[in-house]
Curated annotation (Swiss-Prot):
GO molecular function, one term: enzyme inhibitor activity
CDD domains: Complex1_LYR_ETFRF1_LYRM5 (cd20265)
Gene Ontology biological process terms, A to Z: negative regulation of oxidative phosphorylation; respiratory electron transport chain
A single cellular component GO annotation: mitochondrion
Gene name as annotated: ETFRF1
Protein name, per record: Electron transfer flavoprotein regulatory factor 1
Description of how the protein assembles with itself and partners: homotetramer. Interacts with NDUFAB1. Interacts with ETFA. Interacts with ETFB.
InterPro entries found in the cross-reference section: Complex1_LYR_dom, Complex1_LYR_ETFRF1_LYRM5, ETFRF1
Function: Acts as a regulator of the electron transfer flavoprotein by promoting the removal of flavin from the ETF holoenzyme (composed of ETFA and ETFB).
Organism: Homo sapiens
Amino acid sequence: MKMANSLRGEVLKLYKNLLYLGRDYPKGADYFKKRLKNIFLKNKDVKNPEKIKELIAQGEFVMKELEALYFLRKYRAMKQRYYSDTNKTN
C-alpha cells in the first residue's frame, strides 16, 4: 500500500508538471489539457507498480520533449530577432 501511495504522488506530480508545460503548447492549452486528461484517465486502472513506473518514465520523456520544443521555439525567435538584420545586409 505504501508503494501505491508513493507512486500516486509521482503520478500527480507528473500530471501537474505536464499541465503546467501545456500552457504554451502550439495547438493551445485547452487542446493539450483534454489530451492529457484522456491519457491519464485511460491508464487510471493500472495497478501493477512496474507498469506504473514505465508509464511515469514515458510521461517524463514527453515532458523533456516538450521542454526541448519550447527551448527551440524560443531560440528560433531570438535568432530571428537578433540576426535577421545581419542576414539582410549580406
